[in-house]
């Protein structure tokens, strides 16, 4: 079996009237099938614990799929049933960062992943 990889593109999106609101993600991740990856989304310019953080997936040529969301204030989560066994959402309040961990990666996980407030 030849070497293969999975490419995950990370994009942040924020809504609101204040231009200083930012969600920052580190960029492209290159991982091997079967591995796990933890994607980060660092928030700034607003009170992190006051807004739910959403994660969305988009495969090439396809529409957006809502993965789930997390309440940074209390850690409460909601998941799309499709992703429940694939994804774990967490936050670190001290660094105002949201995370999504994807496990047992396959070619179907190669996509653009958005975090959105």
From Swiss-Prot:
List, alphabetically, the GO terms of the cellular component aspect: extracellular region; immunoglobulin complex
Q: Which SUPFAM superfamilies match?
A: Immunoglobulin
Which species does this protein come from?
Answer: Mus musculus
Task: State the residue spans of region: Complementarity-determining-2.
Answer: 69-85
| Pfam families for the chain | V-set (PF07686)
Coiled coil ranges:
none
Region named Complementarity-determining-1: 50-54
What span is annotated as the signal peptide, if there is one? Answer: 1-19
The segment annotated Framework-3 runs over 86-117
Superkingdom of this entry's organism? Eukaryota
User: Which intervals of the chain are annotated as region Framework-1?
Assistant: 20-49
What S-S linkages are listed for this chain?
A: 41-115
Miscellaneous section: This germline gene belongs to a set of closely related genes that could encode V regions of NPb antibodies.
Assigned keywords, A-Z = Adaptive immunity, Disulfide bond, Immunity, Immunoglobulin, Signal
What are the BP-aspect GO terms?
immunoglobulin mediated immune response
Where do the record's region annotations for Framework-2 lie? 55-68
A single Gene Ontology MF term assigned here is: antigen binding
User: What is the name attached to this protein's record?
Assistant: Ig heavy chain V region 23
